[in-house]
Amino acid sequence: NAFAMPGGFIGVHTGLIMATQSESELASVLAHEISHVTQHHLARQLGAQSQAQLPMLLSLAVAILAARSNSDLAQGALMTGQAASIQRQLNYSRDFEREADRQGIQLLERAGFDIRGMANFFGRLQKYGRLYENNAPGYLRTHPLTTERIADMENRIQSRPYRQVADSLDFLLVQAKLRASEGTPLDAVTKFSSQLRERNFTSEIAARYGYAFALARDKQYAAAEQ
């Protein structure tokens, strides 16, 4: 996936670029992370954690006093303080994710991408993570339920006009290079050779680039130059 870091930096895994089915989907994830930065979520999260330390310290003080007379009471007081602190942090995280989704949609639209890319990509994430969602208690999730987030996104884009956006050649070339870097060189050569032979590609230029890159990995330099 992708993540926001201190200083306004954003990290992107190559797996995300390969998993997206359009440039708008990739842009939607980046818009979400950019919104984390512009809305100062990390700084606000750290501030919330600092505020959460006071209840924890009070619970610890109560636990120490209670331990003199009743160890079970002491343990209960400490666990209550910990649970309250964790729940408060999770609430902040869920709110930040919702805000980043909403701000991200606006940013995506202003940048000229298809805003439906966000709902499409998160929809696939929901399918991949369904097993996790069915077994994890909702209140412990650090992100809102995927179904809730998708529903909110779809509600926000319904009133907006449809915009079909073609993928740029740069995006397709990057995807081709990453896919040509997967697995063994011979496997990559076979994969791209098959795509070109069967004409199973979005862009012939990107497919030929991936094939040449795979051939170079396999040390077939003369064939790659052709």
Could you tell me what each predicted segment is?
Residues G11, E25-E33, V37, Q75, ...:
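Short alpha-helical catalytic segment bearing the HExxH-like zincin motif
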Residues G11-S28, L90-D95:
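Short pre-active-site segment immediately N-terminal to the catalytic Zn-binding motif
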Residues S24, I34-Q51, S69:
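Catalytic Zn2+-binding segment of zinc metalloproteases
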Residues L46-L54, Q75-A77, G112-F122:
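Acidic/histidine metal-binding catalytic segments
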